[in-house]
């Protein structure tokens, strides 16, 4: 079941869903608008291969900065954070979707990481890309996406109880932590 506006506001007011900071004006009929934070991380162009199992390759040739805005260049991939910290209970999951007005500028909000598990707490790392032929400026604090909340049965092992929860309590835009997975059944 997808939560509607009054349910979203009620769940947040009662502390069942944590949104910090929370602005009631951002509650939409079937979602909650979320805003862009001020931390940005991106890869510099080069020919070095990124190997998801080699931590050092995940972090080389990266730049990061905090700022009130960021100009996303055509074709550029940039990680950004949400302004809001999101905390979910063990029976609510969320998906993040882009805002239509932002998409119409050529900005994709996430590549594939749009699912937020029950039990997650932290800022959400956005995997943004500019498919426009022109640079697009995005501002910290601007509504950039929306969270849709789904009520499920209580899960047996929510994200905050998983021993390998790599992104629990993350703050700032977070580079992939795929290197923390073990190689299994690889020939």
UniProtKB/Swiss-Prot annotation:
It comes from Methanocorpusculum labreanum (strain ATCC 43576 / DSM 4855 / Z). It is an enzyme of class 3 (hydrolase). DCTP binds at residues 99-104, 117, 125-127, 146, 159, 166, 170. Signal peptide: none annotated. Belongs to the dCTP deaminase family. Gene3D superfamilies: 2.70.40.10. This is dCTP deaminase, dUMP-forming. Bifunctional enzyme that catalyzes both the deamination of dCTP to dUTP and the hydrolysis of dUTP to dUMP without releasing the toxic dUTP intermediate. One of its GO terms (biological process) is dUMP biosynthetic process. The gene is dcd.
């Amino acid at each position: 079941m997808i939560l509607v506006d009054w349910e979203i506001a009620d769940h947040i007011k009662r502390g069942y869903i944590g949104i910090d900071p929370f602005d009631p004006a951002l509650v939409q009929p079937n979602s909650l608008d979320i805003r862009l934070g001020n931390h940005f991380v991106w890869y510099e162009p080069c020919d070095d291969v990124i190997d998801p199992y080699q931590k050092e390759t995940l972090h080389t040739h990266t730049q990061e900065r905090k700022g009130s805005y960021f100009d996303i260049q055509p074709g550029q991939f940039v990680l950004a954070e949400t302004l809001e910290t999101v905390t979910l209970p063990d029976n609510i999951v969320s998906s993040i979707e882009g805002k239509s007005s932002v998409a119409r500028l050529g900005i994709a909000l996430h590549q594939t990481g749009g699912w937020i598990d029950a039990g997650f707490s932290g800022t959400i790392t956005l995997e943004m890309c500019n498919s426009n032929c022109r640079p697009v400026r995005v501002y910290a604090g601007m509504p950039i996406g929306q969270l849709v909340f789904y009520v499920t049965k209580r899960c047996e092992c929510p994200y905050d109880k998983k021993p390998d929860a790599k992104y629990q309590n993350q703050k700032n835009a977070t580079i992939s932590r795929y290197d923390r997975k073990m190689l299994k059944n690889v020939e």
